[in-house]
Design a protein with these regions (language model features):
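Extracytoplasmic
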Residues: 1-231
Protein backbone atom coordinates (compact mmCIF):
# COMPACT_ATOMS: atom_id res chain seq x y z
CA UNK A 1 0.00 0.00 0.00
CA UNK A 2 1.12 3.56 -0.57
CA UNK A 3 -0.12 7.07 0.08
CA UNK A 4 0.32 9.78 -2.54
CA UNK A 5 0.30 13.40 -1.35
CA UNK A 6 -0.68 16.13 -3.79
CA UNK A 7 -0.21 19.88 -3.23
CA UNK A 8 -3.40 21.84 -2.55
CA UNK A 9 -4.63 23.79 -5.55
CA UNK A 10 -6.54 27.01 -5.01
CA UNK A 11 -9.79 27.13 -6.96
CA UNK A 12 -10.88 30.25 -8.77
CA UNK A 13 -13.78 32.14 -7.20
CA UNK A 14 -17.30 31.94 -8.58
CA UNK A 15 -17.03 35.54 -9.79
CA UNK A 16 -13.89 34.63 -11.75
CA UNK A 17 -15.53 31.49 -13.12
CA UNK A 18 -18.65 33.29 -14.32
CA UNK A 19 -16.82 36.34 -15.69
CA UNK A 20 -17.42 36.73 -19.41
CA UNK A 21 -19.96 33.89 -19.53
CA UNK A 22 -23.13 35.86 -18.68
CA UNK A 23 -24.17 36.06 -22.32
CA UNK A 24 -24.15 32.27 -22.58
CA UNK A 25 -27.37 31.72 -20.61
CA UNK A 26 -29.68 29.06 -22.06
CA UNK A 27 -33.35 28.17 -21.60
CA UNK A 28 -32.93 24.41 -22.18
CA UNK A 29 -34.40 22.20 -19.43
CA UNK A 30 -32.97 18.81 -18.48
CA UNK A 31 -34.86 16.62 -15.98
CA UNK A 32 -33.04 14.09 -13.79
CA UNK A 33 -34.76 11.67 -11.40
CA UNK A 34 -32.91 11.52 -8.08
CA UNK A 35 -33.76 7.85 -7.56
CA UNK A 36 -31.82 6.81 -10.67
CA UNK A 37 -28.18 7.73 -9.92
CA UNK A 38 -25.42 6.89 -12.36
CA UNK A 39 -23.29 5.72 -9.42
CA UNK A 40 -23.03 6.04 -5.63
CA UNK A 41 -20.13 5.90 -3.19
CA UNK A 42 -21.37 2.80 -1.37
CA UNK A 43 -24.27 0.38 -1.03
CA UNK A 44 -25.87 2.34 1.83
CA UNK A 45 -26.77 5.19 -0.54
CA UNK A 46 -29.76 3.83 -2.42
CA UNK A 47 -33.22 4.93 -3.62
CA UNK A 48 -35.99 5.18 -1.02
CA UNK A 49 -39.64 6.23 -1.14
CA UNK A 50 -41.64 9.24 -0.01
CA UNK A 51 -45.44 9.29 0.20
CA UNK A 52 -45.82 12.50 2.20
CA UNK A 53 -45.82 14.78 -0.84
CA UNK A 54 -48.25 14.18 -3.68
CA UNK A 55 -45.96 15.82 -6.23
CA UNK A 56 -43.01 13.54 -5.53
CA UNK A 57 -42.90 11.23 -8.51
CA UNK A 58 -43.45 8.48 -9.38
CA UNK A 59 -46.47 7.85 -7.14
CA UNK A 60 -48.97 5.02 -6.97
CA UNK A 61 -51.97 4.78 -4.61
CA UNK A 62 -51.50 1.05 -4.10
CA UNK A 63 -47.77 0.47 -4.50
CA UNK A 64 -44.66 1.76 -2.79
CA UNK A 65 -42.60 3.52 -5.44
CA UNK A 66 -38.91 4.38 -5.14
CA UNK A 67 -38.89 8.12 -5.84
CA UNK A 68 -36.18 9.76 -3.73
CA UNK A 69 -32.65 9.15 -2.48
CA UNK A 70 -30.72 10.20 0.57
CA UNK A 71 -32.20 11.10 3.97
CA UNK A 72 -30.19 9.59 6.84
CA UNK A 73 -28.59 7.16 4.39
CA UNK A 74 -26.61 9.97 2.70
CA UNK A 75 -25.17 12.18 5.42
CA UNK A 76 -21.72 10.79 6.21
CA UNK A 77 -18.81 12.94 5.05
CA UNK A 78 -17.39 11.51 1.83
CA UNK A 79 -20.55 9.78 0.64
CA UNK A 80 -21.64 10.83 -2.85
CA UNK A 81 -24.06 10.27 -5.69
CA UNK A 82 -23.44 10.81 -9.40
CA UNK A 83 -25.87 11.58 -12.20
CA UNK A 84 -25.23 11.41 -15.92
CA UNK A 85 -27.03 13.83 -18.22
CA UNK A 86 -26.68 15.15 -21.74
CA UNK A 87 -26.59 18.77 -22.90
CA UNK A 88 -27.69 19.78 -26.38
CA UNK A 89 -26.84 23.49 -26.22
CA UNK A 90 -23.67 25.09 -24.86
CA UNK A 91 -24.34 27.66 -22.17
CA UNK A 92 -24.88 28.46 -18.51
CA UNK A 93 -27.16 26.16 -16.57
CA UNK A 94 -28.62 26.37 -13.08
CA UNK A 95 -28.90 23.04 -11.27
CA UNK A 96 -32.23 23.19 -9.44
CA UNK A 97 -32.97 20.54 -6.86
CA UNK A 98 -36.19 19.59 -5.13
CA UNK A 99 -35.06 18.46 -1.70
CA UNK A 100 -36.04 18.21 1.94
CA UNK A 101 -33.33 18.80 4.53
CA UNK A 102 -34.97 17.90 7.82
CA UNK A 103 -32.09 15.95 9.36
CA UNK A 104 -30.07 18.81 10.88
CA UNK A 105 -32.62 20.83 12.85
CA UNK A 106 -32.13 24.57 12.48
CA UNK A 107 -28.90 24.15 10.53
CA UNK A 108 -27.83 23.84 6.93
CA UNK A 109 -25.98 20.90 5.41
CA UNK A 110 -23.40 21.05 2.64
CA UNK A 111 -22.52 19.19 -0.52
CA UNK A 112 -19.41 19.49 -2.67
CA UNK A 113 -20.34 19.87 -6.34
CA UNK A 114 -18.32 18.21 -9.09
CA UNK A 115 -18.88 18.57 -12.82
CA UNK A 116 -17.09 15.84 -14.79
CA UNK A 117 -14.84 15.04 -11.84
CA UNK A 118 -13.77 18.62 -11.11
CA UNK A 119 -14.95 21.21 -8.60
CA UNK A 120 -15.38 24.16 -10.99
CA UNK A 121 -14.85 26.98 -8.46
CA UNK A 122 -14.13 27.49 -4.77
CA UNK A 123 -17.71 28.10 -3.65
CA UNK A 124 -18.81 24.78 -5.17
CA UNK A 125 -16.93 23.09 -2.32
CA UNK A 126 -19.81 23.96 0.03
CA UNK A 127 -23.20 24.31 -1.62
CA UNK A 128 -25.76 24.87 1.15
CA UNK A 129 -29.06 23.12 1.83
CA UNK A 130 -31.13 24.93 4.45
CA UNK A 131 -33.28 23.22 7.06
CA UNK A 132 -37.02 22.92 6.52
CA UNK A 133 -39.53 20.21 7.33
CA UNK A 134 -41.14 20.83 3.95
CA UNK A 135 -39.82 20.13 0.47
CA UNK A 136 -37.89 22.99 -1.13
CA UNK A 137 -37.09 23.80 -4.75
CA UNK A 138 -33.85 25.76 -4.93
CA UNK A 139 -30.90 26.11 -7.33
CA UNK A 140 -27.48 25.10 -6.06
CA UNK A 141 -25.83 27.98 -4.23
CA UNK A 142 -24.04 29.01 -1.07
CA UNK A 143 -26.58 31.38 0.46
CA UNK A 144 -25.02 34.42 -1.21
CA UNK A 145 -24.88 33.31 -4.85
CA UNK A 146 -27.00 31.06 -7.04
CA UNK A 147 -24.54 29.00 -9.04
CA UNK A 148 -24.59 28.73 -12.81
CA UNK A 149 -22.44 26.14 -14.57
CA UNK A 150 -21.08 26.44 -18.10
CA UNK A 151 -21.61 23.21 -20.03
CA UNK A 152 -20.63 22.21 -23.54
CA UNK A 153 -22.84 19.91 -25.66
CA UNK A 154 -22.46 16.25 -24.80
CA UNK A 155 -22.70 13.96 -21.78
CA UNK A 156 -21.69 15.18 -18.32
CA UNK A 157 -21.47 13.77 -14.81
CA UNK A 158 -22.83 15.70 -11.82
CA UNK A 159 -21.49 14.52 -8.47
CA UNK A 160 -22.76 15.67 -5.07
CA UNK A 161 -20.57 14.72 -2.10
CA UNK A 162 -21.34 15.11 1.60
CA UNK A 163 -18.98 17.62 3.21
CA UNK A 164 -18.88 19.70 6.36
CA UNK A 165 -18.27 22.74 4.18
CA UNK A 166 -18.12 25.93 6.19
CA UNK A 167 -19.44 23.94 9.17
CA UNK A 168 -15.99 22.38 9.39
CA UNK A 169 -14.76 25.62 10.96
CA UNK A 170 -17.63 25.50 13.45
CA UNK A 171 -16.84 21.90 14.37
CA UNK A 172 -13.20 22.78 15.01
CA UNK A 173 -14.20 25.78 17.14
CA UNK A 174 -16.59 23.67 19.23
CA UNK A 175 -13.92 20.99 19.65
CA UNK A 176 -11.49 23.63 20.96
CA UNK A 177 -14.14 24.96 23.35
CA UNK A 178 -14.92 21.47 24.67
CA UNK A 179 -11.20 20.78 25.14
CA UNK A 180 -10.74 23.98 27.14
CA UNK A 181 -13.82 23.35 29.30
CA UNK A 182 -12.63 19.80 30.02
CA UNK A 183 -9.29 21.16 31.23
CA UNK A 184 -11.09 23.68 33.44
CA UNK A 185 -13.28 20.88 34.80
CA UNK A 186 -10.22 18.83 35.77
CA UNK A 187 -8.78 21.82 37.64
CA UNK A 188 -12.05 22.22 39.52
CA UNK A 189 -12.07 18.51 40.42
CA UNK A 190 -8.64 18.91 42.02
CA UNK A 191 -10.22 21.38 44.43
CA UNK A 192 -13.68 19.91 45.00
CA UNK A 193 -13.18 16.21 44.41
CA UNK A 194 -15.73 14.11 42.51
CA UNK A 195 -18.46 14.78 45.15
CA UNK A 196 -18.37 18.48 46.02
CA UNK A 197 -19.99 19.73 49.23
CA UNK A 198 -22.91 21.94 48.17
CA UNK A 199 -22.80 23.77 51.52
CA UNK A 200 -19.15 24.78 51.19
CA UNK A 201 -17.88 27.96 49.56
CA UNK A 202 -14.84 26.89 47.59
CA UNK A 203 -13.93 30.45 46.62
CA UNK A 204 -13.38 29.62 42.95
CA UNK A 205 -12.80 33.25 42.00
CA UNK A 206 -10.00 33.52 44.57
CA UNK A 207 -8.48 30.04 44.32
CA UNK A 208 -8.96 29.39 40.59
CA UNK A 209 -9.17 32.83 38.97
CA UNK A 210 -7.72 31.64 35.65
CA UNK A 211 -10.25 28.82 35.41
CA UNK A 212 -13.19 31.14 36.11
CA UNK A 213 -11.91 33.63 33.53
CA UNK A 214 -11.47 30.89 30.93
CA UNK A 215 -14.98 29.53 31.52
CA UNK A 216 -16.37 33.00 30.84
CA UNK A 217 -14.31 33.22 27.64
CA UNK A 218 -15.47 29.78 26.48
CA UNK A 219 -19.09 30.72 27.19
CA UNK A 220 -18.69 33.80 25.01
CA UNK A 221 -17.01 31.75 22.27
CA UNK A 222 -19.86 29.21 22.32
CA UNK A 223 -22.43 32.02 22.12
CA UNK A 224 -20.63 33.35 19.05
CA UNK A 225 -20.80 29.90 17.45
CA UNK A 226 -24.55 29.70 18.10
CA UNK A 227 -25.06 33.18 16.65
CA UNK A 228 -23.10 32.19 13.54
CA UNK A 229 -25.15 29.03 13.02
CA UNK A 230 -28.49 30.77 13.56
CA UNK A 231 -27.46 33.81 11.51
Amino acid sequence: NEITVFPYEDKISYDEYISGKQEAATTDVIHIDAETPYATSDYTVYPIYDRKSSITEPQDPAKIMLNTIGSEKWQTVGQWTEYEFEVQTAGLYEIVLRYRQNEQTGMYTSRKVYIDGEVPFEEANYAKFNYDTNWQVEPLGNGADTFQFYLEPGKHILKLEVTLGEMGTVVRQVAQIVDSVNKDYLEILKLTGPSPDKYRDYGFGRVLPDVVEDLVLQSMALTNVVDYIEG
